[in-house]
Every structure is written in C-alpha cells, then in structure tokens.
Regions:
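Hydrophobic transmembrane alpha-helices of multi-pass solute/ion transporters
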Residues: 1-88, 101-105, 109, 266-336, ...
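Juxtamembrane and boundary regions of transmembrane helices in multi-pass small-molecule transporters
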Residues: 150, 191-241, 414-468
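Hydrophobic alpha-helical transmembrane segments of multi-pass integral membrane proteins
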Residues: 80-86, 109-142, 331-337, 360-400, ...
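Hydrophobic core segments of alpha-helical transmembrane domains in multi-pass membrane transport
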Residues: 13-26, 37-47, 83-88, 123-126, ...
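Juxtamembrane helix-boundary/capping and inter-helix hinge elements in multi-pass membrane proteins
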Residues: 94-99, 109-113, 146-157, 183-190, ...
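Long, contiguous bundles of hydrophobic transmembrane helices that form the permeation core
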Residues: 2-11, 194-319, 468
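Alpha-helical transmembrane segments of multi-pass membrane proteins
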Residues: 112-127, 150-170, 190-197, 201, ...
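Re-entrant/interfacial helical elements at transmembrane boundaries that shape
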Residues: 87, 101-104, 134-146, 175-185, ...
Length: 468
C-alpha cells in the first residue's frame, strides 16, 4: 500500500463503491458511465486517497482526479479509435445486407439437417462487426424462413443463431467489450483474437448441441404468419421460403466477408511477425498494416467502397453517424472501467487484495470470473460486467504476477455470459422476435443457452490457467 493509506480502509472503500455502483445502475436514472465515475470517486474518498494531487516522501504522486483522468485516457488511447471504426463498420454491415448474405452462404455450405450449425456460424461471424441485438434483428427473419422451410423448431434454430452472436460478442475482439477488456489488461489484440476464436468454438458447439438435442425436441414450434408460435404439426409447408430470400438484392460473398476477414488476417500477421521479431523491410510494412487501428480502418474503407455502392450518400452518412453515437457510449463506459482500475492500482489496493488472497490460498483466477458473473446477474449488461470486472481485477492480478493477463481478461469476458434474464435487453430481443411469451419457455430458450456458454468458458479459463 502507498504510505499513509490503510489497506483495510481502501478495501472498505471498494466494497462501498461497488455497492453504490450497483445501486445507481439498478435503481436510478444515472447511466452506467456516470455511475462508474461516481463509484470510483467514492472508493478513493472513503479509502483516504488525496482529493487533489499530492506528492509523498518516496516521490510518488497520488490523487483521485489524477488517477481517474490517467485511467480513462490511458485505456482509450490504445482502443478508442478501433472501437469507433468497428462500430461504424457494423452499421455498414446492417444496411448493406452483408449479414444476410453471410447467413445464406453458411446455409448453402452446411446443407440440409445442419441448420442450427449454419445459424450459429452465421452469428459467430456477424457479431464481430454488429451488436448482438442488431445482428439478431437483421438475421432472424432468415432463421424463421429456414424453420418454416425444413419444418424444424424455430426455437432451436433461433437459439443457435443468438448463441453464436453472443459468444463472439463476448469473447472475440474487435467487438467493443472484449476490446475494452484487452485494453484494460494491456494484452496484445492479435493474441486475444486468436485465443478468443479458439475459446469460442467449444462454447458454440455446446450451444448447438443444446439447441439440437433439447430445444428442437422439447419446443417443436414454428412462427405463424402473425409471429405467434404454433406446433410444427399445425404448420403449412412452404418450400419456397429460402428461395425467395436468395433472390433478394444482396452483396456478393466476397464483398460481404472481405471487410471483416481482412482486418483479422492483418492483425494476426502482425502478431506472428512481432513474435518472430521480424520487423524490418517488408515485414515492417506488414506489421504497420497489422496494427489494429490501421487494420480495422482498412476494413472500414473496404466496406464503404464495396458495400455502399447502392446506398445513397445521405443514407450512408446518417447510418454511420448512428454507429458513432453507439461508439460514444461504449467509449465512455470503457474509459470509466479504466478509471476504476487506475484507482485500485495507484492506491496499492490491488497488491493488498492479491496478497490477502494468496495467504488465504484462494485461486486468483476465480476473482475476475466471479466478479463479472455477479455484476452480469445483478445489472444485466455483459459489456458493463466484463469492463467492471477488468477494471477491478487487472491491477490485482498484475500485482500478484501469478495469472497470465490474457487468462484474466478471458475470465472477465466469460463470466459476463451468465444467465441472461429480464434485466438483459438481448433476452427480450431473442424471445420477442421468436414469439416466446411464457417465462419458463423464455428461460429454456435463452437463459439456459447463455449459462451453458458461461460454464464452458469457465472450464476453459481454468484449463488455460494451468498451462499459461
């Protein structure tokens, strides 16, 4: 601990600050970003940190405002532009029809009897540039049409789609939440993408097995013309549903996938070349192009050039500005999480907690996972849950030095998937669009699906912690 600061007093400040954060998010009209900053100030004040910058005898400077601004700016300096580019890219995917083209491509690739797999993979890719809610709204009509065409449960197909969406959204940058966590933990984005994809695959498989093995048989329903659920046995077969979708004016396969695949490939090339210490000549150019800001920017430019050819300038700019509005909220929340983490780091509270857990023989890797799980269950937002957990635990794990930062970051991301229910907007999007109205069925459709993904993520984090 910093001299003149009490570990127990700072810990009390943290507990009260988190209680204030949860109260403000749940019971007031105060936005999560403002609540994060208020909670950060409460932690510092109750913990005894100087209100303004103060220099101690050992030469260290400390102050609540200094820590807040340092944490906020430091977190966003590396990822702010990437988040902005990524959210705008997502808006382009929405209005261009690229997401629908992805869905149809995977349906054709997987063929009959593998509709759940096709929808899960579609969600897996679509969610990288597009938010879960928007992605499901855009692609769910295709899932419904597929269910009517093959006479399969729309619940199983829809849950597989939603599962693919939320898994990637929670685990793989450059989606905003994981990217924010990567920034707070200061881990390499390329490594985070590669490991995130590897972690997401078993999670998606588990969701597919649940959709095919349980939901398809226990909830054999299809949407009627008015959107309500009816038994498959009562439904009139319509073999032309998918054909009509394929005839829509959508961008081509290459045009749809290239703006998404290009940045990922460039970032991964950068990671590999940097690891091999190949940084001169042409390798240096590739490393430059593989910097996340440049790579995502190139993907955005490619999307503008190829996917907006049939969209008028006014519409394109208006939709991209909507994306910028969404980016603003994400940037503020992410920066707020960074400010929270900086208070914990600067005060020495992270070291204090790490030493206490070490003496108690409590596995440190459980801390970010359980905090993310708890915040998620209490207030509903997966992004807020993982950012809050990262802000609290990144300095603690760094002080301990026994947990790989990448593993800690994924623990924050995985914990945010726990039991989506009434306080999660995506819970309502999925169930309402699928026509599920009974609470028990809503839990079976979506809450259990996310909890399965959460359990697999937890197991993967524990295994990773043994080897990394």
């Amino acid at each position: 601990m910093i001299e003149n600061l009490s570990g127990n007093q700072m810990l009390l400040g943290l507990i009260i600050g988190l209680a204030v954060l949860i109260f403000l998010v749940l019971k007031t009209k105060i936005h999560a970003f403002v609540a994060l900053i208020i909670a950060t100030v409460v932690i510092g004040v109750i913990g005894g940190m100087p209100l303004v910058k103060e220099t101690f005898p050992d030469g260290k400077s400390l102050g609540i405002i200094m820590s807040i601004t340092k944490g906020f700016g430091g977190t966003l300096s590396g990822i702010g532009i990437i988040i902005g580019f990524g959210v705008i890219l997502g808006k382009i995917f929405e209005i261009s029809g690229a997401a629908q083209r992805m869905a149809i491509t995977f349906l054709n690739l997987f063929g009959k009897k593998r509709e759940e797999e096709a929808m899960a993979i579609t969600g897996f890719f679509v969610s990288i540039p597009i938010f879960c809610d928007s992605g499901f709204i855009v692609v769910s009509p295709i899932a419904k049409a597929i269910a009517r065409t093959v006479k399969k449960s729309v619940i199983g197909i829809g849950a597989a789609l939603a599962g693919g969406l939320v898994i990637t959204h929670s685990m793989v940058p450059p989606t905003p939440g994981p990217l924010g966590v990567a920034g707070i933990f200061n881990v390499d984005v390329g490594q985070f993408i590669l490991i995130g994809i590897c972690m997401a695959i078993p999670m998606a498989i588990a969701v597919i097995l649940y959709a095919k093995g349980y939901l398809r048989h226990k909830m054999p329903f299809i949407n009627d013309e008015d959107g309500s659920l009816i038994s498959i046995k009562e439904f009139d077969y319509n073999p032309n549903a998918v054909i009509s979708l394929e005839e829509k004016d959508l961008p081509g396969v290459f045009t749809s996938f290239a703006p998404l695949v290009l940045p990922i490939i460039l970032i991964l090339i950068n990671t590999v070349l940097s690891a091999l210490k190949l940084k001169t000549g042409f390798y240096g150019v590739l490393i430059f192009l593989g910097q996340p800001i440049i790579a995502v920017g190139l993907g955005l430019l490619l999307a503008i050039v190829t996917q907006l050819r049939n969209v008028d300038r006014e519409t394109a700019l208006r939709e991209m500005e909507k994306g910028m509005e969404q980016a603003g909220i994400i940037l503020l929340v992410t920066g707020g999480g960074g400010a929270l983490g900086q208070i914990i780091k600067d005060s020495g509270l992270g070291t204090y907690i790490a030493q206490g857990m070490a003496h108690a023989n409590i596995p440190l890797i459980l801390l970010p996972f359980l905090i993310s799980t708890g915040v998620r269950f209490i207030q509903g937002s997966g992004t807020v849950a993982m950012i809050t957990a990262a802000g609290i635990t990144a300095p603690i794990l760094a002080a301990a030095g026994t947990v790989n930062p990448i593993v800690g970051a994924f623990a924050c991301c995985g914990g945010s998937l726990f039991f989506s229910y009434f306080n999660d907007s995506f819970f309502w999007v999925v169930n309402r669009l699928l026509g599920v109205t009974q609470t028990k069925d809503q839990f079976r459709t979506w809450s259990y699906t996310t909890t399965i993904a959460w359990a697999v993520a937890g197991a993967e984090v524990l295994i990773m912690n043994l080897f990394m």
